[in-house]
Amino acid sequence: MKKESLNIIKNIYAKGGNIIQYLKDSGNLKNNTDEIIMISYDLQSGNYIKYVKENPEFNEKYTLAVSKIFNKIGIKCNSILEVGVGEATTLANLIPKLQNIPKKIYGFDLAWSRVRYALEYMKKKNILNTFLFTGDLFNIPLADDSIDIVYTSHSIEPNRGREKEALLELMRITKKYLILLEPGYEFASAEAQKRMEKHGYIKNLYSSAISLGLKVIEHRLFDIYSNPLNPTGLMIIEKDPKNNKDVHNPLICPITKTPLELIRNSFFTKEGLLVYPIIDGVPCLLRDNAIIATHYVDNFENI
């Protein structure tokens, strides 16, 4: 997909077109790609906040139900991450409901525009101890065992066929628990399953977790979901703590896997000699955002 086409795609979206289906058809593709998902969600930016403002009841019920999962686990949690944070409509309304509010709150999304909306939404909710950035679910710019509790809310959803890949990457960064709120294909009706297959939604998340030997401590239909044709399944995975590392700087370069440091308002890896920009407050930490800057830390004033 060429970036020159974005304005055409935006016009199709404005007229009510299904962007994911359009992009798949135009590329003769069976499954969703990262680029298709990014374009689709970037175009939708702002809609989730608008929906929650107009329909606060569902969000309140959903985040309350999610908070009960965290509170039931009851561990001391220093850090939390929402993968696929979107516009932070879940994260921002979940945090105040937690009995133990983490010191560090993280969230990332593939789409820059969604993260930009999320930043403002978190500010309006007066939740300020957050770090939101762009990132890739399959190449997360975070170190191993760096986040106490990692959770998703229909974020793995459009990645059918990549369930194992997603689980392995999520477990890599998880220190204690991974909480997955994703399409419950195994709990869905025949009609709902057919719809999930049409949209390219995941359907083998639980079986993938079992085949990988992960410690699934809970798996059931979640109490709250907005669409009966896309029921939410809950899966909680506990990570064996014996090999966990203590991580002080969780951010890593998605290419070299070396630590990132905030230098001159950008994130730089001294070992990898790559720099990642911060655009309007949003750190851009996708592989494609990397800029080669072998002399980034030079003292240019001495020229």
What are the language-model segments listed below?
Residues 1-34, 249-303:
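N-terminal auxiliary segments of SAM/dcSAM-dependent transferases
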